[in-house]
Amino acid sequence: MINVYDDFTKLNEVILGDINLHLLETVNVKYRQQVEDIFLQTRDDLVAIQTVLESKGVKVHRPKISKAFAKTITTPAWTEQGVRNCLSPRDSFAVVGDVLLEGASHKRSSHFESLYYKELFVELFQQGGKWISMPPPALSDLSYDNESYLTNIEPILDTAQLARFGNRLLVSTRGAGNQLGVEWINRTFDKFEVIAMDGCFSGHLDAQIKIIRPGLVISPYAREKHPDFMQKWDIIPTKIYGDALAIIDDRFQDDDWDNTYFQTSMLSYDENTVFVFDHYKKLFPTFIKDMERKGVECVFIPFKHQHWFSQGSTCLTCDINRSGGMEVYD
């Protein structure tokens, strides 16, 4: 049953992404062997993550992969070499309350990404779930701007720009959405209090802040930058990861191109348990100790190439069912 009103109550059902190896044919021959190695290792890591999730009683769904997704995509506005890989469903899909939402991604390669999950979405709909999509954006050149990245001529919003907190819905537009996208969310989910968080958050919201439970948040930002309801919360401080992206062009030569890379995209099992990548034990021991002091258990999972993919454990998943409801948190 579709039910997600927060990002921290007990996780019962989830989508876990995968790697479509057929997309290797769209990769520059110069890098193809290295990318294949990364793809294969990542696929193995995802199998291990699925095993950990299932050991905790979580029902896990996986995308349906097809060679057809490597075909060239052509619309009246653009041409793209293949559908985006199915590694990070959280970027394009989210359950908001009792509604399965397909977002309006700013990436042209995501135009047909839902085909990976179509059978599952139909199944969830047949079980009684609600299912809606944002208007598919044209994503012509007019949708992009050098200064703000995205213009405001059509609604655009990655679903990774949403964070759920009971009757509140937090949303950011920086880099992966625009104001029309936020307004579409505001009108469509009018039973929620929609809170815009554009004061400082850049990139996907789930990679910037993480609500562990009411009263505790992981964040790199000063207290005054947070919404009013968070002003008295405990904050576990982190670094802003943005500087690492400046050397992204080197990632094919060095898979450790940003070893200090940290993002708060961490999947919660419940209010006291989060899934954290293995290498954080070595790279961020202070953070792990801070979590333990707050009574939060870190369950370590493998994901060797987080740096290369720029993904966290939340990015790799899409919650389908959590135990929480539309609570009103003080």
Language-model features, listed with the residues they occupy:
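The feature marks the mature, well-folded catalytic cores of soluble enzymes
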Residues: 1-330
